[in-house]
Amino acid sequence: MPSVNFRPMLACSESAHNFFDKLMLPLLASAKLDGIRATVRDGVVYARSNKPIPNKYVQSLFANYEYVDGELIVGESTAHDVYRQTTSHVMSHDKEDFPVRLFAFDHVKNLNDPYNLRLANLEHCLSGEHVVLHNQKYIETMNQLIEFEKLCLECGYEGVI
């Protein structure tokens, strides 16, 4: 049983433009990735459903990144078929030695801590070629958010989260 009572949230399917009046500035934003959500607890890499990721290679690569929450991506993060490629590899039991990375964006051991402290904990525990800190952009105005969303879309990401 996982030691942390944690269930990842899903991104909203509607555009941020529909929620402008509800957003509280400043905020942190990042490019929305289209991979498989993953959280490491008790040495096991779990999917958003709180079921273990079935791939043995993924489990061996990321089991030591306790409390790291992120998105598994196979290949280029902006490839048109990134979700299909990621699912095909990550959900297969026996595929090995494929170009998978964990784009880490939170450290969920102490969820009541402010995000800046969780981010510091995350930065402290990351190392290796397969783990990448997923950058957050500090946004102070709605115009900055709109421009950041445009940039993310132009680069091939799904949008902003």
Predicted regions mapped to residue ranges:
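Amphipathic alpha-helical
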Residues: 1, 136-161
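Phosphate/adenylate-binding "loop-and-lid" substructures adjacent to NTP/NAD/dNTP-binding pockets
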Residues: 1-19
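Short, motif-level signal for alpha-helix interfacial/capping segments enriched in acidic residues
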Residues: 11-17, 82-84, 139-146
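Generic recognition of cysteine residues
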Residues: 12, 125, 152-155
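Covalent nucleotidyltransferase
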Residues: 17-130
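A generic structural motif
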Residues: 71, 134-137
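Short aromatic/hydrophobic-glycine micro-motifs
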Residues: 130-131, 157
